[in-house]
Each structure stands twice: as C-alpha cells, then as structure tokens.
Swiss-Prot record:
Organism of origin: Bacillus subtilis (strain 168)
UniProt cross-references to SUPFAM superfamilies, sorted A to Z: Sigma3 and sigma4 domains of RNA polymerase sigma factors
Protein name: UPF0122 protein YlxM
Residues that span the membrane, as ranges: none
Stated family: Belongs to the UPF0122 family.
Signal peptide: none
Superkingdom field: Bacteria
Biological role: Might take part in the signal recognition particle (SRP) pathway. This is inferred from the conservation of its genetic proximity to ftsY/ffh. May be a regulatory protein.
Amino acid sequence: MSLEKTTRMNYLFDFYQSLLTSKQKSYMSLYYLDDFSLGEIAEEYEVSRQAVYDNIKRTEAMLEQYEEKLLLLKKFQERKEMFNKLKELASGSKEEEEITALIEALEKLD
C-alpha cells in the first residue's frame, strides 16, 4: 500500500469517521492507524480475513464517496495551501509579526 493512499485514508477517516458504524471505525483504526494486518484484525474479531478485507474496501469506497460530496479534505488542503502562501507573502513585510500572528490565529480555528 502506498504512503499517499495511507495518508489520504487517514485524513478521510479523521474527517468522516462520525459517519461510520462502530465496526467500520474499529477496522479502519486498527488497519490504518495501528498498522494491524488483515489477519490480526480477523483474529481479534473472530471473522475471516476476507470479511475484514471486504469491510475495509467498502469503508474506503464510502469515505471516497463522502469526500466527493462534501469535499472536506479538498477544502482543508486548499486552506492549508493559502495559509502557506500568506506566510510567504508576509515574510519581509514591515507588519510581518502582526500578519503572522493573524495567520496563526486563523490556523488554530481550522
């Protein structure tokens, strides 16, 4: 599994986990956050490895569908990029400290 996919799934899970069932949350958390193998999760829940795999794949697809509709990750990434550009523009300005403080305050709200 690629690092990009893992990172994306972690972000999607953070944004949309409240929309998942407790079993989906648990499987995704164990697989992506705790780095459990499919076999370890299957053993923990006394189900087949295939059942865990199917559940994780369905949940990944659901998370992608939520993102297609709600765009929380996309908007988060765009805001992050804008903050970085603002910081670049602020450096060297005579009001740099004040601008930087405002940017940091905005980031804390996010």
